[in-house]
């Protein structure tokens, strides 16, 4: 367990490779209602096999971290502080891999000039926030919009399993793995829904590759939440291309080809850090 500046104990796991490649440590940042558990060992193993030391953590109020009783008080800035407390304890700037909410936190770190070796954005929140996505969903998929509102207010365990399967896993049926995933989820701070809208910008206004870390973007072309146009918006800001995962859902770590995705990430990081 690590501690943040409020002395809350944070769940923090370190996975060591059999042989180190010399790459900086990789710190995985999870999405909403999740925790360190959301990155399956099968997704991490290709990175370990390539010689990377990998960290997973849970923000305050998530997973095994303290602060669950105040989950409705926490803001995006609190989760950023938790991540910074982990990064500051490392001996050198790390590689940050952020999924969904974690990608928003990673972009805040870039904006705030936090020392980083590289950043990987998975199923990325657009630089301008989720307001455009929320409006699109309100008009094109009002049931999904309603269910997301329920997740942030009534609680994630009141969300329709069928809607969760469709939005997160691009599935039409509620399978056992979807049920297992949802059973592990925790409630989320309603403030986060506001913080992620983008009224206060989460990303740098302009990306300067000369003084900012290299950015890698990975997104599924069948993501029902972060559409291809949203991922492309991120790529335009960070002056890069999207690595499209064919048939990939929002939860890339759980797709059939998840290990191929993490293997590609490891190879790509070696290239951008050469």
Tell me what each language-model feature is.
Residues 31-35, 100, 221:
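Active-site glycine-rich loops that stabilize anionic/oxyanionic intermediates
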Residues 32-44:
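The serine-hydrolase catalytic nucleophile loop
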Residues 47-68:
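Conserved alpha/beta-hydrolase
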Residues 78-94:
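Conserved acidic catalytic loop of the alpha/beta-hydrolase fold
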Residues 115, 119-150, 192-199:
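Flexible "cap/lid" loop of the alpha/beta hydrolase fold
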Residues 211, 217-219:
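Short beta-strand/loop motif that positions the catalytic acidic residue
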Residues 224-230:
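Conserved alpha/beta-hydrolase "acid-adjacent" motif
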Residues 248-260:
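Catalytic histidine-centered segment of alpha/beta-hydrolase-like enzymes
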């Amino acid at each position: 367990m690590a501690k943040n500046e409020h002395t809350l104990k944070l769940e923090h796991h370190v996975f060591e490779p059999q042989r180190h490649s010399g790459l900086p440590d990789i710190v995985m940042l999870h999405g909403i209602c999740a925790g360190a558990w959301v990155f399956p060992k099968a997704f991490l193993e290709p990175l370990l096999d390539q010689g990377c030391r990998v960290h997973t953590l849970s923000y305050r109020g998530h997973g095994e971290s303290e602060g669950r009783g105040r989950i409705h008080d926490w803001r995006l800035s609190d989760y950023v502080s938790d991540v910074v407390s982990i990064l500051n304890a490392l001996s050198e700037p790390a590689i940050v891999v952020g999924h969904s909410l974690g990608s928003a936190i990673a972009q805040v770190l870039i904006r705030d000039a936090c020392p980083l070796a590289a950043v990987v954005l998975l199923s990325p929140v657009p630089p301008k926030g989720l307001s455009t996505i929320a409006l699109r969903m309100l008009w094109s998929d009002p049931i999904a919009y309603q269910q997301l509102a329920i997740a942030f207010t009534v609680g994630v365990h009141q969300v329709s399993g069928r809607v969760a399967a469709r939005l997160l896993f691009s599935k039409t049926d509620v399978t056992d793995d979807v049920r297992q995933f949802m059973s592990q989820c925790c409630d989320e701070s309603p403030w986060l829904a506001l913080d992620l809208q983008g009224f206060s910008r989460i990303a740098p206004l302009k990306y300067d590759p000369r003084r900012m870390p290299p950015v890698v973007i990975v997104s599924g072309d069948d993501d029902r939440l972060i559409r291809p146009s949203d991922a492309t918006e991120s790529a335009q800001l960070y002056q890069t291309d999207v690595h499209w995962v064919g048939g990939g859902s929002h939860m890339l770590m759980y797709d059939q080809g998840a290990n191929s995705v993490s293997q590609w990430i490891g190879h790509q990081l070696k290239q951008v850090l050469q």
